[in-house]
A protein has these predicted regions:
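Conserved alpha-helical substructure of the radical SAM core
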Residues: 54-91, 95-96, 100-214, 222
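Local cysteine-cluster metal-coordination motifs and their immediate loop/turn environment
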Residues: 135-145, 372-375, 402-405
Length: 406
């Protein structure tokens, strides 16, 4: 088991991949440059506000609303960094980058909650996760789609494209394509991207398996924005054991480098298991993430769903406190501005509620059914049903069972 590796001391994790190390390096924007960019972003926000509303009183109200929204999630914490990739500036993994085509529409969509925006299009969703295949070569300890893995596919390629089209008609800032392992349906992935409206960003959620340089190039050319690659330990053997696949760690390194080499934004995703959590382990993981040159690291708390169903995997208060303290140190302390930005949903969900559950996001499973999120499997209907709007309303009214849906 993975616990057997916890006592292993590693000062530095050597890279084991045989391909050349990428020359790509995400630019961490800090210091004076950060202040200049933040000032320019404020100018963009004002421009969007003026586009959305004619009444100057609404301009003031909208600006105050955005300030409250920021404080709601960040509190008084001061941002010390953002990431610049391909000339676009990213403050988070789940918001379009400033200077990207979808940024202004994303902001207008948030303003729509302050007061309905009647000038221009707004998005119904910030993020939608869409599992496009049941196929997977791994058997991960925490897999939330465990009961469906490697069963017969239900949706045809045409139906998959129809689902993407229907969601985009509602308006969505980002669509995250997952599985199973989506890279096992490479031609389907490319076809989905080629046929999609480029108004949305598309991300790949993957173990990294089969993200070769050729596949990374094909996906970039088809319109993929970035890849979220799962890595559950900085020790290769521990990750391989957790994933029940002897080459799992190797493919993580390959995937990150190949994605970086093709100008895809990269993120690592860590399941913060009870066995893993310690300041030492978290820091060793971030050192490796920095070495691999990813822009973001996502912390996902384990949930008792899928392969973890009926297991004591939820973090206790002491473990949560360790992760939260570490998250704040890396993200909001100037001394760690060279490290990737951490995305930690649990931190905000405990304080502000869940924005998924059909409100700002949802999960579409491999049958085309809608669920509150990948970790909350409560189907309310199918995207392709004529009655989809009512299914969506039922999803939103049900909200999230783990956190309040504000």
């Amino acid at each position: 088991m993975v616990e057997a590796f916890q006592e292993k001391k590693i000062e530095e994790t050597p890279l084991i991949s045989t391909t050349p190390v990428t020359a790509f390096k995400p630019q961490m924007v800090t210091g004076l440059r950060l202040k200049v960019v933040q000032l320019k972003i404020k100018g963009t926000l004002l421009k969007v506000i003026i586009k959305c509303y004619r009444n100057p009183l609404d301009w003031i109200g909208a600006l105050l609303y955005l300030i409250r929204l920021r404080r709601r999630f960040l509190g008084n914490d001061k941002v010390h960094k953002m990431v610049c990739v391909n000339g676009k500036y990213h403050i988070g993994l789940y918001t379009p980058a400033w200077k990207s085509p979808g940024y202004e529409r994303f902001i207008a969509s948030q303003l729509h909650d302050f007061k309905p925006v009647t000038k221009g299009a707004v998005n119904r969703f910030n993020n939608v996760f869409f599992a496009i295949t049941k196929k997977c070569a791994l058997q991960c300890e925490h897999c939330f789609e465990w009961e469906n893995l490697n069963k017969k596919e239900v949706l045809s390629e045409k139906e998959l494209q129809g689902i993407v089209k229907r969601i985009q008609e509602k308006g969505v800032s980002q669509i995250h394509l997952s599985g199973g392992e989506p890279l096992l349906k490479m031609d389907t992935l490319v076809a989905l991207l080629n046929n999609a409206d480029k108004a949305s960003e598309f991300w790949l959620v993957t173990s990294g398996f089969k993200l070769t340089n050729t596949n990374a190039r094909r996906l970039k050319e088809a319109g993929l924005t970035g890849a979220v690659i799962s890595l559950d330990h900085f020790i290769p053997e521990a990750h391989n054991t957790f994933r029940h696949f002897k080459d799992a760690y190797y493919w993580v390194e390959e995937a990150v480098k190949n994605a970086n080499n093709n100008n895809l934004i990269t993120a690592l995703s860590l399941c913060t298991t009870r066995e893993f959590i310690s300041e030492e382990n978290l820091m060793a993981y971030m050192e490796l993430a920095k070495k691999l040159k990813v822009s973001f690291v996502q912390f996902l708390e384990p949930k008792a769903v899928g392969h973890y169903a009926n297991k004591e995997v939820l973090l206790n208060q002491e473990e949560i406190a360790v992760v939260e303290k570490f998250f704040k140190k890396i993200n909001f302390t100037a001394a760690y501005s060279a490290y990737p930005i951490i995305i930690y949903h649990g931190y905000y969900q405990r304080r502000q509620g869940c924005l998924s559950g059909g409100k700002k996001g949802m999960y579409i499973d491999t049958d085309g059914d809608i669920n509150p999120c990948p970790f909350c499997h409560k189907k309310t209907g199918n995207v392709l049903d004529p009655d989809f709007d009512n299914h969506l309303e039922a999803l939103a009214s049900g909200g999230c069972s783990a956190y309040d849906t504000n």
